[in-house]
């Protein structure tokens, strides 16, 4: 009755959205997005408010060769969890079983279903100082010291405004393309 959008179809039915309800302030309570991923296959994204809680991707091939794409790892009603600040705490499609956050709402530990972890250390201003990846019995520590990045105590990269220099092995220069 308040002229709110409840359904949307675009591209000859290749993409549709369905709003399943609004709260008293006019915020969307749930949104389902259907998109055609190939000639006859569709996917489904389900949101609760502005938080994603489920993605069903039925595509078996990539829309683009070697494209970065979503991998539908599980089929559950609630594939994502959030804390009271809206931070993602679980992503079952990526195998993330828990993400804990520090007092600045920055991720401090990410735990995966295979037992692997990523631990982050920050300065008081939120600057990332260290990342520790533990995969099985292998631990890789990356330290961020100004414009120099160290991996397991050895200089790896030197960052500059123009790009970066790979310091491991033979030095290689990589330049950023700036078109502004």
Give the label of every model feature segment.
Residues 1-174:
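Acidic/glycine-rich beta-solenoid
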Residues 179-180:
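P-loop NTPase catalytic cores that bind/hydrolyze ATP
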